[in-house]
Swiss-Prot record:
Region called Disordered, residue ranges: 1-31, 252-296, 338-365, 482-514
Keyword Phosphoprotein in annotation: yes
Matching Gene3D superfamilies: K Homology domain, type 1, Zinc/RING finger domain, C3HC4 (zinc finger)
Repeat as UniProt keyword: yes
Function: RNA-binding protein. May be involved in post-transcriptional regulatory mechanisms.
UniProt record, GO biological process: protein autophosphorylation; protein phosphorylation
Post-translational modification: Phosphorylation at Ser-462 creates a docking site for 14-3-3, which stabilizes the protein and modulates its ability to bind RNA.
Protein name per UniProt: RNA-binding protein MEX3B
Assigned keywords, A-Z: Cytoplasm, Metal-binding, Nucleus, Phosphoprotein, Repeat, RNA-binding, Zinc, Zinc-finger
Amino acid sequence: MPSSLFADLERNGSGGGGGGSSGGGETLDDQRALQLALDQLSLLGLDSDEGASLYDSEPRKKSVNMTECVPVPSSEHVAEIVGRQGCKIKALRAKTNTYIKTPVRGEEPVFVVTGRKEDVAMARREIISAAEHFSMIRASRNKNTALNGAVPGPPNLPGQTTIQVRVPYRVVGLVVGPKGATIKRIQQQTHTYIVTPSRDKEPVFEVTGMPENVDRAREEIEAHIALRTGGIIELTDENDFHANGTDVGFDLHHGSGGSGPGSLWSKPTPSITPTPGRKPFSSYRNDSSSSLGSASTDSYFGGGTSSSAAATQRLADYSPPSPALSFAHNGNNNNNGNGYTYTAGGEASVPSPDGCPELQPTFDPAPAPPPGAPLIWAQFERSPGGGPAAPVSSSCSSSASSSASSSSVVFPGGGASAPSNANLGLLVHRRLHPGTSCPRLSPPLHMAPGAGEHHLARRVRSDPGGGGLAYAAYANGLGAQLPGLQPSDTSGSSSSSSSSSSSSSSSSGLRRKGSRDCSVCFESEVIAALVPCGHNLFCMECANRICEKSEPECPVCHTAVTQAIRIFS
């Protein structure tokens, strides 16, 4: 080490001087050389003690580091000091030879600087200077914009308003766009000022401007989200089910004025509109009944009050549920091509044979049963007209006037002819091949023979157990409209269903006096009629054989036949 070298030189010089004076062993030249060296060292100020302290303190000074916290006013100042992708803070670290830890979002805006004392002091001065510079720039910018009126708002310009447009948190960046291009475009197009929400705040855009411009900006924001995400934002939380098409409240149905089973399946009138706050995704969402287990009334039954070809195409497999069927006459001519007219009250009327509104059926309306009235295994009550009551074994009860013939099969048009497009859900048994079953959840519409039927509209043949189900009596006056019905006991169809009588005995129990013979075989009793012509001149076997032909037609009028129905008289 230099300090030890200088100390040895000093000790040797003093010792040599003493020896020279005492013994005279050293020459004068050596003493002069040593003295000259000591003088040079003394001129430099590096004697033995000072040199030792200087060289010993230097490594200790290099190893000492310090850490200091430098606060700034806000997180905006932090962003300004750090710079884009940290370019400014990297340059400051290299300039001051320090390590500067930047604060993360959500923490206090404090920089932590580590390094030598003078380097830390330099970095601290740079950070504070940059923060003050940014504060001055922001203050002057706010002052100039406030004087120029560039920041619109209710306090500055009269007539302007501010609204809040709430969007999902995940689409905030979508609305802002790359480098704010989308939100700037919306501001320029609508002449509004839009404040973008911060990351740690609610996803609400504050739009300021004239009322019409504010509305335009809101629509632009929602349209942009819809364009990029494929949907429209629901403004209220209660419309989530409506937006997804998975539920429908009972308010639409009960709003039509109906109550009970009929109103649950009724189609809303045009006066019923969706909630104002709702922005529907689809045009077929006005009356979705998916939560009730049936198809949408709007989608499959006309889609409004005007019939259309597309709606007729969709009617092949859909029909209203049985509890809402009431074959009543009403003035609504909203015919959907399936023989029914659906009204707000949950009723259905059968159109005239030629589809003209002036030839509507003239039978009396059949009101819906009261709540709590049995729907299955019920019998008709005795009507005020004096007609006897009788059980009817079919999918629905007839409320139409009977024909003038001795048989009491009924067609809504009256007489011996039936409408060609009427859905005869009353006393109808579809022609099916033996052993086949195709249950449906709703009454059959006009279809090809054998396409399927309601699970209650079971085919009733003259075999044991063929006694069918008795549906509810939809009117008290039905007995008067079915002349010649044989009085029965009060047990109704439940007794007939539990009986194990043979086919001949069960069919003979339904016969009445003066019955006719089949016009084909002239052996069996006339118990069947053909659809749609309505000629009731055949037994069930002959009627089935007619329908099972390759080109079935009525032997009387040579009209194409779709099915055979059994007459209960």
